[in-house]
Amino acid sequence: MTKNIHDVAYELQKTIAENEDFQTLKASYAAVQGDAESKNLFEEFRAMQLGLQQKMMQGQEITEEDNQKAQEVVARIQQDAKITKLMETEQRLNIVITDVNKIIMKPLEELYSAQQA
């Protein structure tokens, strides 16, 4: 009997939500949100990150001023233990998700590599 791919995806979603790294990420995010200074700095970082991404997507040049501001924000971020923990935890979870994505994409990879042989 063939499994419904959407059911499997929902099961994966549930498994990720129950994952220890995700639970740590939730707790770290709550800690940042619960500290006004950390929350404001994190929001500033996210806005800066989004602005730079939009510039790049629109083909606009990232100026020296943009780079300088980004470096200043990152330096302040690195001084905030709550945000640093949040980002480290997010990075660990991203590695897990990247690994899962490689597993999911393996049939396509095998298909296309077999076509080239």
Swiss-Prot record:
Gene3D superfamilies linked: YheA/YmcA-like (1.20.1500.10)
Signal sequence region: none
Database matches in Pfam families: Com_YlbF
Superkingdom, taxonomy of origin: Bacteria
InterPro entries: Com_YlbF, YheA/YmcA-like_dom_sf
The family this protein is said to belong to: Belongs to the UPF0342 family.
Designated name of the protein: UPF0342 protein BcerKBAB4_0767
UniProt source species: Bacillus mycoides (strain KBAB4) (Bacillus weihenstephanensis)
